[in-house]
Amino acid sequence: MELGGPGAPRLLPPLLLLLGTGLLRASSHVETRAHAEERLLKKLFSGYNKWSRPVANISDVVLVRFGLSIAQLIDVDEKNQMMTTNVWVKQEWHDYKLRWDPADYENVTSIRIPSELIWRPDIVLYNNADGDFAVTHLTKAHLFHDGRVQWTPPAIYKSSCSIDVTFFPFDQQNCTMKFGSWTYDKAKIDLVNMHSRVDQLDFWESGEWVIVDAVGTYNTRKYECCAEIYPDITYAFVIRRLPLFYTINLIIPCLLISCLTVLVFYLPSECGEKITLCISVLLSLTVFLLLITEIIPSTSLVIPLIGEYLLFTMIFVTLSIVITVFVLNVHHRSPRTHTMPTWVRRVFLDIVPRLLLMKRPSVVKDNCRRLIESMHKMASAPRFWPEPEGEPPATSGTQSLHPPSPSFCVPLDVPAEPGPSCKSPSDQLPPQQPLEAEKASPHPSPGPCRPPHGTQAPGLAKARSLSVQHMSSPGEAVEGGVRCRSRSIQYCVPRDDAAPEADGQAAGALASRNTHSAELPPPDQPSPCKCTCKKEPSSVSPSATVKTRSTKAPPPHLPLSPALTRAVEGVQYIADHLKAEDTDFSVKEDWKYVAMVIDRIFLWMFIIVCLLGTVGLFLPPWLAGMI
């Protein structure tokens, strides 16, 4: 049917009426739903008093179900002993005055209302340390048609917490949060634990602490102020510190600094930096101890384990300073200031080094000792240097006896290969070879000790003692016909120095020394003396190297002039001085070795202490299950 037909004007009014009626009904239904909550609020709060407990009878008890949900563990202040947490306080109770029938209000079963308009239990945090005891942000409450009220306001609490820093930084703390009504006793308001544990579904993990456990318990207590019994719900938080930060920044540096204390006793005493290192370690440990005192509570009844470790190490560092001063004193001792007791020599030079597996290096003083012994033998041997019984007869100026040097002149047989030779008392120098061959005369003569042919000398052989340079070369002539290269003590041995003592021959021998005779001696006379420079070995006495041509009578000794006597006294003085220096050096080395042994003893002691201290630092927390 078309609307433009003849019946169209008749159908249009009924359609418009039907459409208007539907729109009116829909608008009235929306208006009814919106006004239902308004009417409900007017009905609920008309004559409602939020100051009275929501009970029908005065003897009834309001049961409040209480729960806690933690959102974040903000901080644990060890210094002020506070725990800061962000929690949601769950509370639920029934208010009989806030009931309605949903059928009367367009099936409205629940509404959100401002919490300021209704009665709320005055539940506060008992062990609040700072801030507000009660909830400050009053959020809306969820009201159900049966009179049940749910209120979950957020809150940031700073609760007091007794911090136990015994195993710091491997510590585990037990902090509590105690909630309860401030004014209503158990006869008015009773608490019911909503959950046995704290809700951690929305917990944001902390970078320093981890919650091991959080359990809520219901308690009742009668306080001294009042006769009533007050209930409370206490949540015990078991939190454990994450020790990585403190291990990297506190424990490892402390251990390394403590190990430096061990190196103090390994540092040689000659360097002079032992005291400086000790004081530097002591100051470093003091700085770390100050860092710990800033972290731990100042009123703590216990000392943290790392504090005990640092304090123990500081005591040992202080002792190391005292010991180092003593060791340096021992190290620089000398025979002129201290005498080494026998027990010190026995204990620290014999017994303790063997126990510590120490082997003392040998002191290279053999050459010096041989040198001193040689000088003593040269200066004090009676067979070479007896006191002269009288002055020698006067001689001519050209043939006068020159005062010999501290060389030993004794008659020797003419060797197969005559010539001066030098032997060194030192093991480090090779034996010297003869520098020049000499021809031995086949006819003995009582003539004087002469140089080789072609060489004229003004007197006897002169050999320098304590020479430090080569005295001659193979082609060089020396005084008295003696050539030798010497680096140390030498003595000159005339080969044929005297004739057998016969009647009238002694005077002839002395007279023959005053002439420049170049004639060959008769066959029945001793040959002219030939001098050989020899070095005296340390282990062989000079008398052992002397070979006499005749064993029937001892050779006569040469008289000593005053100059030669002074030279002998000088050699004796030098030998005594060197011997005293050698003795002083040996005693000083003994004192230095005693200081080294004492250092080694305390080195091992401190190594053991550091190991035991490290084990003592980590073992108790490990046994307690905190590591």
Curated annotation (Swiss-Prot):
A lipid is attached at residue 271 (S-palmitoyl cysteine). Keywords: Cell membrane, Disease variant, Disulfide bond, Epilepsy, Glycoprotein, Ion channel, Ion transport, Ligand-gated ion channel, Lipoprotein, Membrane, Palmitate, Phosphoprotein, Receptor, Signal, Synapse, Transmembrane, Transmembrane helix, Transport. Changing residue 205 to A: Loss of CHRNA4:CHRNB2 channel opening potentiation by divalent cations. Residues 538-548 have a biased composition (Polar residues). Residues 1-26 form the signal peptide. Disulfide bonds join 161-175, 225-226. InterPro entries: Neur_chan_lig-bd, Neur_chan_lig-bd_sf, Neur_channel, Neuro-gated_channel_TM_sf, Neuro_actylchol_rec, Neurotrans-gated_channel_TM, Neurotransmitter_ion_chnl_CS, Nicotinic_acetylcholine_rcpt. Changing residue 224 to A: Loss of CHRNA4:CHRNB2 channel opening potentiation by divalent cations. Residues 27-249 are extracellular. It is a multi-pass membrane protein. Changing residue 294 to K: Loss of CA(2+) permeability. Activated by a myriad of ligands such as acetylcholine, cytisine, nicotine, choline and epibatidine. Channel potentiation by calcium is stoichiometry-selective, CHRNA4:CHRNB2 nACh receptor is achieved by calcium association with topographically distinct sites framed by anionic residues within the CHRNA4 subunit and between the CHRNA4 and CHRNB2 subunits. nAChR activity is inhibited by the antagonist alpha-conotoxins BuIA, PnIA, GID and MII, small disulfide-constrained peptides from cone snails. It is found in: Synaptic cell membrane; Cell membrane. Residues 501-511 have a biased composition (Low complexity). One of its GO terms (cellular component) is neuron projection. One of its GO terms (molecular function) is acetylcholine receptor activity. The chain crosses the membrane at residues 250-269, 275-291, 306-330, 601-619. Its main location: membrane. Residues 331-600 are cytoplasmic. Component of neuronal acetylcholine receptors (nAChRs) that function as pentameric, ligand-gated cation channels with high calcium permeability among other activities. nAChRs are excitatory neurotrasnmitter receptors formed by a collection of nAChR subunits known to mediate synaptic transmission in the nervous system and the neuromuscular junction. Each nAchR subunit confers differential attributes to channel properties, including activation, deactivation and desensitization kinetics, pH sensitivity, cation permeability, and binding to allosteric modulators. Neuronal AChR is composed of two different types of subunits: alpha and beta. CHRNA4 forms heteropentameric neuronal acetylcholine receptors with CHRNB2 and CHRNB4, as well as CHRNA5 and CHRNB3 as accesory subunits. Found in two major stoichiometric forms, LS (low agonist sensitivity): (CHRNA4)3:(CHRNB2)2 and HS (high agonist sensitivity): (CHRNA4)2:(CHRNB2)3, the two stoichiometric forms differ in their unitary conductance, calcium permeability, ACh sensitivity and potentiation by divalent cation. Cells produce predominantly an (CHRNA4)3:(CHRNB2)2 nAChR. Belongs to the ligand-gated ion channel (TC 1.A.9) family. Acetylcholine receptor (TC 1.A.9.1) subfamily. Alpha-4/CHRNA4 sub-subfamily. This is Neuronal acetylcholine receptor subunit alpha-4. It comes from Homo sapiens.
